[in-house]
Swiss-Prot record:
Family of the protein in this entry: Belongs to the IspH family.
Lineage: Bacteria, Pseudomonadati, Pseudomonadota, Alphaproteobacteria, Hyphomicrobiales
Protein name per the record: 4-hydroxy-3-methylbut-2-enyl diphosphate reductase
Details of cofactor binding: Binds 1 [4Fe-4S] cluster per subunit.
Keyword Hydrolase applies: no
Recorded superkingdom: Bacteria
HAMAP family, per the entry: IspH (MF_00191)
NCBIfam families: ispH_lytB (TIGR00216), PRK01045.1-4 (NF002190)
Binding site for [4Fe-4S] cluster: C18, C105, C204
Binding site residues for dimethylallyl diphosphate: H47, H83, H133, S232, S233, N234, S277
Binding site for (2E)-4-hydroxy-3-methylbut-2-enyl diphosphate: H47, H83, H133, T174, S232, S233, N234, S277
């Protein structure tokens, strides 16, 4: 029997599901329990296809627009995703007489309120974020047309020419890189000293915590694996943070079978984290894949302990989930385990 080479896996903590993702998944599960299938969900509830597929198997139907819901099903509930929606979406739901449950992350809702507060004070709103991301679309959709400008890069900040430089306020997308946002803000605040900040930090605690844990683990890592979907903003930012913080290479993966072990080169230290919408079962799957090839020692790279929770909608608080539902909500679904074994 061949002797396996030693390998240290630095496991970041915190990682994976945040309180907003937990809440959003729970809302869909509770709605299915209370109202029965189908429950419609506008956009992916969170950006992870395994979560989406698991909810589909339980009776959720995902649509991008409300007019995709058949008329014969418009008595069924519809859930708005964790990323938030423009004001026009609940207005359209009311026009269709739809019963809707808002799963917008409370921290995203807070950004919406901060943006509207700026507008009430007659400030033009600068939104730092990524064009096309559902959260950005939702935040911009809270404001009057022409009342918000999207700034994506330092170059955008350098060339921005507002009509009234003395009446500006900013908010940010919650899932941005802390460093990138700081660079953009530095430019904006130097150019526009009167720029009004939000009353509270826009980048969410989970984004900051996961980035800090990645920074702590990156130096000396031959490889840094981030579990997450390509359309997950916070997961892509973790890859960038790992690269900037000293990892020799950093890769975004959705499953263990995406890792090309034959081309990784010599490894002695691999660091591992997961975006806020990535289930823990995929982290377990990746560790198992490495154990088949290496003599693995796990080191925990923990920077903070998270204990945040968010309440679900009042209509759902009397519903009890099964142990299987709880396992799915916590990212440890037996259904996913079975898929892993079939790989």
């Amino acid at each position: 029997m061949s002797i396996l080479s030693p390998l240290i896996i630095r496991l970041c903590n915190p990682r994976g599901f945040c309180a907003g993702v937990d809440r959003a998944i729970q809302i869909v599960l509770l709605a299915l329990k209370k109202y029965g299938a189908p429950v419609y969900v506008r956009h992916e509830i969170v950006h992870n296809r395994y979560v989406v597929e698991g909810l589909q198997q339980r009776g959720a139907i995902f649509v991008e627009e409300l007019d995709e819901i058949p008329e014969e099903h418009r008595n069924q509930p519809v859930v708005f995703s964790a990323h938030g929606v423009p004001k026009s979406v609940p207005e359209q739901a009311d026009c269709y007489n739809l019963f809707y449950l808002d799963a917008t992350c409370p921290l995203v809702s807070k950004v919406h309120k901060q943006a509207m507060r700026h507008q009430r004070h007659r400030r033009h709103v600068i939104l730092i974020g990524h064009a096309g991301h559902p959260e950005v679309i939702g935040t911009m959709g809270q404001l009057e047309k022409g009342g918000v400008t999207l700034i994506e890069t330092v170059e955008d900040a350098l060339h921005y020419q507002p009509d009234d430089p003395d009446n500006l306020g900013f908010v940010t997308q919650t899932t941005l890189s802390v460093e990138d946002t700081a660079e953009i803000l530095d430019v904006l605040q130097r150019r526009f000293p009167a720029l009004e900040p939000p009353a509270a930090e826009s980048i969410c605690y989970a984004t900051t915590n996961r980035q800090n844990a990645v920074k702590a683990a990156a130096l000396g890592s031959d490889l840094f694996l981030i579990v997450g979907a390509p359309n997950s903003s916070n997961s892509r930012r973790l890859v960038e943070v790992a690269e900037r913080s000293g990892a020799r290479q950093s890769i975004l993966v959705q499953r263990a079978d995406e890792i090309d072990f034959d081309h990784l080169g010599a490894l002695s230290v691999v660091s591992l984290s997961a975006g806020a919408s990535a289930p823990e079962i995929i982290v377990d799957e990746i560790i198992s894949a490495f154990r088949k090839r290496y003599n693995v020692t796990i080191e925990l790279a923990e920077t903070v302990v998270e204990n945040e929770t968010f309440l679900v909608n009042r209509e759902l608080r009397d519903v009890v989930l099964t142990p299987q539902d709880m396992a799915f909500m916590n990212g440890r679904s037996e259904m996913l385990k079975n898929k892993n074994q079939d790989m």
